[in-house]
Amino acid sequence: VPTPSAARGIIESIYYHPGLKWHIDKIYVMNPIRFTSIRRNEVKNKISANKIMKEANGKGASYIDRKKDIEQRATMMLRNVHYIIEAHFEMTDQANESDNPGKFQDIITRRLRKGQGRYQPYLGTRECTAHFGLWEGGRIPTISETRDLGYMLYDLDFSDPNDIQPMFFRAKLENGVLDLTDCEVVK
């Protein structure tokens, strides 16, 4: 189940404006929670700026040594996920005079119906792209699972830019719904 901040990130990838702030109300889990394991070959080192400068000046060639610079990583990930995110927004003091909730709602609805966003959202890593649309099907058919998911990241507290703090909450899935409307957030 995505964290509330990840769900907000997905929504902001569809529509972001400094004049509004998103709040996640509920996350509906549509498909059973299932895991799969994958292995990936990844480059373990980045090329340094010095190597790039030497190559640009014709004093060397950069390459990746297959034996030294590539490592295999195992990942346990969710598979066949399907969520519905219920959210609302509030206007902020950065909204322009011409901004209003109706205008934002129309833009968001249009983008959701067309599957358009600012950039392609993803779940966890960019290889796990998220596809989205507007739910207009009435009752949401969630899984019938109730499970305590433990403490989960809620968001980051940016109120003090010199001391950004994580905020957590006790995540409880009730009949396939993670309800965030009245959860207790702790630092």
Segments predicted by a language model, with ranges:
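Internal, well-folded beta-alpha domain core
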Residues: 42-44, 52-187
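Long, hydrophobic N-terminal alpha-helical segment
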Residues: 1-44
